[in-house]
């Protein structure tokens, strides 16, 4: 599922998928936002929040587990960031969800 989210963000935001996987460094603010969006969507759409989920998401994005935790806290506390993520979440569900 994380790979589907990365493909969605890559095609929507027009950035290389290798950047979302952490293989290429982020070059500007828009790419940084897309990278963070990929991480938080991976967490929010994960079917079970069990032990090891954050480490799997962090590994697939080549980031620290603490980043996943900080983004989730930001999502919970910042209404602007929450609306930005919720819009992308809705777009993802429209594109990939099966009815």
Predicted regions and their residues:
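Residue-level detection of the helix-turn-helix DNA-binding "recognition helix"
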Residues: 69-77
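Short, Lys/Arg-enriched anionic-surface-contact patches
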Residues: 11-38, 63
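Helix-turn-helix DNA-binding helix
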Residues: 64-68
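Short Lys/Arg-enriched helix C-cap and helix-to-coil transition segments
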Residues: 77-99
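Short, amphipathic alpha-helical "recognition" segments used to contact nucleic acids or chromatin
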Residues: 32-51
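Short alpha-helical "recognition helix" segments of helix-turn-helix
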Residues: 52-61
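General nucleic-acid-binding
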Residues: 1-13, 98-99
